[in-house]
Design a protein with these regions (language model features):
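Extracellular/periplasmic juxtamembrane segments that couple receptor/chemosensory ectodomains to their
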Residues: 181, 201-228
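Allosteric regulatory "coupling" segments in signal-transduction proteins
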Residues: 95-105, 193-204
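Solvent-exposed, extracytoplasmic
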Residues: 64-80, 150-196, 200-202
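Charged, alpha-helical scaffolding/interaction elements associated with membrane systems
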Residues: 23, 114-115, 221
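Extracytoplasmic/periplasmic ligand-binding sensor regions of membrane-associated signaling proteins
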Residues: 78, 84, 89-167, 174, ...
Length: 228
């Protein structure tokens, strides 16, 4: 059984492989989905507010960005981050762990430069090749709307594992978080999970093209439901 949640629109779908689902199972899935989305939304909002607050602090000491990043090293460690990074508009990046990076051309970097605050899908870390999730937000000039660069908080890809690992259906249930394009944001670490799934639409399409199309249409229109 797979419960699939979407960020940012936080809709949920259920996929049962095998016997036909009765209403009790559907109701149980819906309740599990609602609880999970509340927990994920709470964590997401708390983390994003924290990153945006850091961006404000950085803007206030922007005349010494290197020293500001040094001060953030202990902050990153305290909150379980892999690193905190600040990127100038040209992509040149300062990091709390000394990683040498240039973020120019990165999708999330470019979105933040346009003023968006974003949680990335699961992506490959340019520093070491491991899977990560990244919160990014713009850093504004303290006295204007000028964007000075992008602040990023980098987490290992198990960022929501404690929430997604909550047991459902005697330990047989597991959860993914996907975005509005169907891309996996947070994968499940359950032993029965589909670890190789990158996009849920593409995955379902391999088995049932009509189901994949229906799923995509429902989610794009703000619907909810299940498929077998």
């Amino acid at each position: 059984i797979i419960l699939v949640g979407l960020i940012p629109i936080t809709l949920f779908f259920s996929n049962s492989i095998g016997e036909t689902m009765d209403q009790h199972i559907i109701d149980t899935m819906e309740n599990s989905a609602e609880l999970c989305v509340e927990m994920v939304e709470g964590r997401y909002e708390t983390d994003m507010q924290m990153i945006e607050s850091l961006a404000v602090q950085l803007s206030l000491s922007f005349d010494e960005p290197e020293r500001a990043m040094e001060r953030m090293s202990s902050f990153a460690e305290r909150y379980g981050m892999k690193r905190v990074a600040f990127s100038y508009p040209d992509g040149v990046t300062l990091t709390t762990d000394g990683s040498e990076l240039n973020m120019k051309g990165g999708e999330n970097f470019e979105r933040a430069l346009k003023g968006e605050s974003v949680l990335s899908t699961a992506i490959v870390d340019r520093a070491d090749g491991n899977m990560i999730n990244v919160y990014v937000c713009p850093v504004y000039h303290k006295d204007s709307d000028e964007i000075l660069g992008v602040l990023a908080a980098v987490y290992h890809s198990d960022i929501f594992e404690d929430i997604l690992a909550a047991s459902t259906f005697d330990g047989e249930g597991y959860t993914y978080i996907i975005d509005s394009k169907g891309d996996v944001v947070i994968n499940s670490h359950h032993t029965n999970a589909i670890s190789e799934m990158v996009n849920i639409y593409d995955y379902v399409k391999e088995y049932d093209e009509n189901a994949a199309s229906s799923l995509k249409t429902l989610l794009e229109n703000g619907g909810e439901g299940f498929f077998e």
